[in-house]
Amino acid sequence: MASETEVKIRAAVTKALNTSAAFNRKLKNPFRRHMFLTGIHEPMAEELSLDHLEVSGEIPETLVGTYARIGPNPYKPDPRGHHWFVGDGMVHGIRLAEGSAEWYHNRYIKSGTLERNGGPPAAGGPRRGSRDTVNTNVLKLAGKTLALVESGPFPFELDRNLDTIASVSYTHLTLPTT
């Protein structure tokens, strides 16, 4: 449970960020494209499943497993008020086995926030607060693949194909889980 001081600080910071974003959204669109919505920061437009990837060179047969990374990928970004830390979580992964690249998948974390932004339906599970975007870290813990964020929402469990199963609560933890 957050302390009274923490609640007041979060409320003040949230109000300031929302006020700043609202101001930015009223500005006319700039002549140039938004720096965090182009180039290497440009959001992926869709989820992909690519199988039996072509490999240049060799992958050692002993290198087996899934490499996954996560980051913000706004579903419907507003270029007038976008910050690159803020964005729906998207996990990317590549599965290696027997000297081959079996697949590449990228998947949105099926949060309630993503659903409210017009994305696919949210996965089940407990929530802490109305904003449940996770977009900072992905790790394996006790046999589960978890997507996390440092700001407070519960982690989301992912299956072996990186699809969202549900949010997960470790009830004895009252602070962020990363």
Give residue spans per PLM region.
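Short, glycine-/Ser/Thr-/acidic-enriched flexible segments
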Residues: 74
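Beta-propeller domains
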Residues: 41-45, 55-63, 77-126, 148-170
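Intrinsically disordered, low-structural-confidence terminal and linker regions
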Residues: 1-47, 51
